[in-house]
Regions:
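Extended carbohydrate-recognition surfaces in non-catalytic/accessory domains of CAZymes
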Residues: 21-103, 157, 162-165, 591, ...
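Accessory beta-strand-rich segments of carbohydrate-active enzymes
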Residues: 24-26, 36, 80-182, 204, ...
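Beta-strand-rich structural segments
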Residues: 196-200, 266, 651-655, 696, ...
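Short glycine/proline/serine/threonine-rich loop/turn segments at secondary-structure transition edges
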Residues: 95-98, 138-142, 156, 247-260, ...
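Extended substrate-binding grooves/exosites of carbohydrate-active enzymes
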Residues: 34, 52-68, 118, 168, ...
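Short flexible loop/turn segments that cap and initiate beta-strands
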Residues: 43-46, 208-213, 255-260, 656-670, ...
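Short S/T/G/P-enriched beta-strand
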Residues: 630-650, 656-658, 710-734, 740-747, ...
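Extended acidic/polar, glycine-enriched regions
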Residues: 199-289, 687-690, 709
């Protein structure tokens, strides 16, 4: 009996030494202080009084909007600074024969990481993911990791960046034999052929005979292919395995059916698995054609995409999968099929969701190269870091089937020989960047490429060395063939930002080059605000150098207002839709975002560009796209029906699957309207009278659907509506609070102050109302209604049972809603 027990213990110890790598979240039990001292890196520093929190965390979003914040309105008018994060931890199963790493998905910015007082490294770029090895300085107990985050020199970004460890952190333990960090590159063709390049590190001091077992699993975890390979790896050497496999009858990854597979790679020493590494991938084919545009799996289609910045509204830059999913789900319902990551590598969660939900992705590296756009931006670090940062982005992301395009930059000033934004304010720089510059030449007589063209080629070469399977582009706002990025002839895909008037010349200027609108539209809208007459299109500002003022700090929710360099939604879509060679577009933007409040300055502090506002309320133009991009029946009538007696009102309607629509006011027809060529809405100009306005859609003489809007009475009560009635522990619930009349109609002019409180296992983590100029804090338990509504975001604690949210307001009946827990 004793012999059996001893054998079991020895076997257990032997097995533990061969256990596979582990990668665990390292987000909890951090300490935080918005202060700076060199002593804070020391493991002996007393941090007992520091704030306790969990990651991801963005300290800027917790602050007040102020005109004096150095980020300026373009950066969201929120504070920056220097802060430290510290975490005390043990490693219960500490093994001297293992290697330990810490992975940061993203820290903004200039993050210096210390372990037990030893500097592991400093990374300037706030949007890149990276890893440090901790092994030499790690102990079994009483470890301290300390991270100094420096976002004090501002402005350094043309939009809201956030501050802090705003993405997830992971603790990784590996055996001496393991798949390298981002060490797989999987390509798969529609006929089922899979090729995998797999890099295996031998960090031991001996030669190792390694067996590599690869297994492909489908979405139901069924094994569909296996193979084994063997190599001898010398000490402290990284070996490359080139593996070929076959899956019979693979299910393809597509927009409609985003089928995913997993390559499970097992590193074996003898018969023992010492490391397991999983890579998600998909089978698909695609190409861009200079005459016919974009093709996916043999199907010609348009890329109906949007650009999005990385913030999550009232949550700031702090990553949460539920909030990203909410953004993508609303865009998917609109018919959007593509995301441009503007203008930086995104959170891994976004790419994972794009894989599983069926979005095409344009993954972008930088907003600037050598030449700065703001005083303290990444251009200061570009020469020292661009090769590593660009390489790391591609290595991290290249297995995602959703990514079909790499972008090496956005509106970089290297398009021109002489272009400089150094002496401009961020607001001026944003405007001039889209206005263009004079083209000059300094190429030598012998045809040598301009230095900016050489840099373009160098960056494309870096991408192609790591991934030759995808096209490379850049978002260019200089449409001339003399653009120095285009002159490099290195870009596979010509990308224009705006300039729809130049698109007709693309086939002539760039023969045999495929084309896509890398950025388009830049229309300006505030949810619920309408400027009439609606057929008067407003440029704001009229020219990029002109000021624009409006005491309301709002923009029209009709599609009749856009920035000086841009165009309306309808006019842009008409060009994209009716030119076969245009592969598609990425609209600026899918969602409003913090910062860049064109055309205004402070107190405006978030953008007007989105199809969906910052709180997640769709603007009316959302339904124009839904009517064009989906097969869903659409009949959207706007604006609301609460005006002054006799006031002349323009009623718009977006619709599809009908020949004509007829408007009625209190039962009296106002006429039948048909869509005109190159227009995507119909309009009636009518005189307001209280009651009901109704629109009826006809097809082949039959009524197919109808909708109506009635005049709302005085505010009577609050109505709470949850987008999701259940929530996982640690998950988010998004709850709309509306001010309604006694009959339940939303009061479109209501601006009541609403107060919120929770009961149970959870907390309020953010409030918003979609206003681009509200000075109210996002981290609060109250919010004014904006055109009759606002948003409350609650987080369910873990473990969770249920959470009640109560809303009240002066002279308003209260409401309560319950969010149940889900597993």
């Amino acid at each position: 009996m004793k012999i059996k027990i001893l054998t079991t213990l020895i076997g257990l110890l032997f097995a533990l030494n061969g256990m596979a790598s582990e990668r665990k979240l390292f987000d909890d039990h951090w300490r935080f202080a918005l202060q700076d001292s060199a002593t804070m890196s020391s493991p002996n520093f007393n941090d007992n009084a520091w704030r306790r929190l969990s990651l991801p965390h963005d300290w800027a979003i917790e602050g007040d909007f102020q005109a004096t914040n150095p980020s300026g309105a373009t950066g969201g008018a929120l504070p920056g600074g220097i802060a430290w994060y510290r975490k005390h931890f043990d490693v219960p199963a500490f093994d001297r024969n293992k290697h330990y790493f810490i992975d940061f998905d993203g820290v903004y910015m200039n993050a210096s990481v210390y372990l037990n007082g030893h500097l592991l490294g400093t990374r300037p770029y706030g949007f890149i993911s990276y890893r440090y090895e901790m092994t030499p300085y790690l102990k079994a107990k009483d470890n301290v990791i300390a991270v100094r985050v420096d976002n004090s020199e501002q402005p350094n970004c043309r939009w809201y960046s956030g501050c802090g460890i705003y993405r997830h952190v992971y603790l990784v333990s590996s055996n001496t034999l393991h798949v390298a960090h981002w060490g797989t590159f999987v390509t798969a063709t529609t006929d089922g052929k899979v090729s995998a390049e797999i890099k295996v590190d031998n960090q031991s001091q001996r030669r190792e005979v390694v067996t590599l077992r690869n297994t492909i699993l489908d979405s139901s975890k069924k094994v569909v292919s296996t193979t084994t390979d063997k190599q001898t790896i010398q000490p402290d050497v990284q070996a490359t395995f080139n593996v070929n496999m076959l899956v019979n009858g693979p299910k393809l990854w597509s927009i409609e059916q985003p089928n995913l597979y997993v390559l499970r790679t097992e590193v074996m020493r003898g018969n023992r698995v010492v490391d397991t590494y999983e890579t998600t991938f998909g089978f698909r084919s695609f190409h861009f054609d200079a005459q016919t545009g974009f093709w996916l799996n043999g199907k010609n289609m348009k890329i109906n995409g949007v650009c999005n910045h990385h913030d999550l509204g009232c949550l700031g830059a702090a990553v949460h999968r539920d909030a990203i999913y909410r953004q993508l789900k609303m865009l998917k319902d609109m018919g959007c099929n593509a995301i441009r990551c503007s203008h930086n590598p995104p959170a891994p969660e976004l790419l994972e969701l794009c894989d599983s939900m069926g979005f095409i992705v344009m993954d972008e590296s930088f907003d600037m190269w050598h030449r700065k756009k703001t005083k303290y931006d990444y251009s200061r670090y570009f020469d020292a870091w661009f090769e590593r940062d660009l390489s790391d982005m591609v290595k991290r992301d290249r297995n995602h089937p959703s990514i079909l395009i790499w972008s090496i930059g956005n509106e970089v000033l290297e398009q021109w020989n002489s272009a400089d934004a150094d002496q401009l304010t961020p607001e001026q720089a944003n405007l001039i960047l889209n206005a263009g510059h004079a083209i000059t030449h300094d190429s030598t007589d012998n045809g040598t490429l301009n230095v900016n063209s050489q840099l373009t080629k160098r960056m494309v070469d870096i991408v192609k060395q790591l991934d030759p399977t995808r096209p490379v582009t850049a978002g260019c706002n200089e449409p001339s063939p003399d653009n120095l990025l285009f002159k490099s002839n290195a870009l596979d895909l010509i990308g224009y930002n705006y300039h729809i008037e130049n698109i007709k010349d693309v086939p002539k200027n760039f023969p045999n080059k495929p084309f896509i609108m890398t950025e388009s539209v830049s229309a300006l809208q505030t949810t619920g605000y309408y400027m009439m007459p609606s057929d008067s299109v407003r440029r704001a500002p009229q020219e990029w150098w002109m000021p624009y003022t409006n005491p309301s700090f709002m923009c029209s929710a009709y599609d009749n207002m856009h920035a000086a360099w841009s165009s309306t939604h309808e006019s842009t879509w008409d060009v994209v839709k009716n030119n076969d060679f245009v592969g598609g577009q990425f609209i600026w933007t899918g969602w409003d975002y913090l910062g860049e409040p064109t055309p205004y300055g402070f107190p405006a502090r978030s953008s007007y560009f989105g199809i969906i506002d910052l709180a997640g309320f769709p603007k009316d133009v959302y339904y124009m796209y839904q009517s064009e991009w989906t097969q869903k029946p659409v009949l959207h009538l706007f604006p609301h029906w609460n005006w002054l007696d006799g006031q002349q009102i323009d009623m718009w309607c977006y619709f599809n699957q009908a020949d004509a629509v007829e408007l009625f006011i209190n039962g009296i027809s106002q006429g039948i309207q048909h869509k005109k060529p190159h227009e995507y809405h119909v309009k009636w100009r009518v005189n307001y009278e209280p009651g009901t306005v109704m629109v009826v859609a006809h097809k082949q003489g039959k009524v197919v659907r109808q909708t109506e809007i009635s005049t709302a009475g005085a505010p009577d009560h609050i109505r709470l509506r949850a987008e999701n009635s259940t929530c996982k522990p640690g998950g988010l619930a998004f709850i709309e609070a509306e001010v309604v009349d006694k009959d339940g109609r939303r009061c479109p002019w209501a601006d009541n102050q609403l107060y919120f409180e929770t009961e149970g296992n959870g907390e309020i983590v953010g409030v918003d109302n979609g206003s681009q100029f509200s000075m109210e804090r996002f981290k609060a338990n109250q919010r004014k209604a904006f055109f009759g509504r606002c948003l409350v975001v609650v987080k369910m604690d873990s473990p969770a049972s249920k959470l009640k949210l109560k809303a009240r307001g002066i002279d308003l009946k209260a409401d309560t809603i319950t969010i149940e827990s889900s597993k």
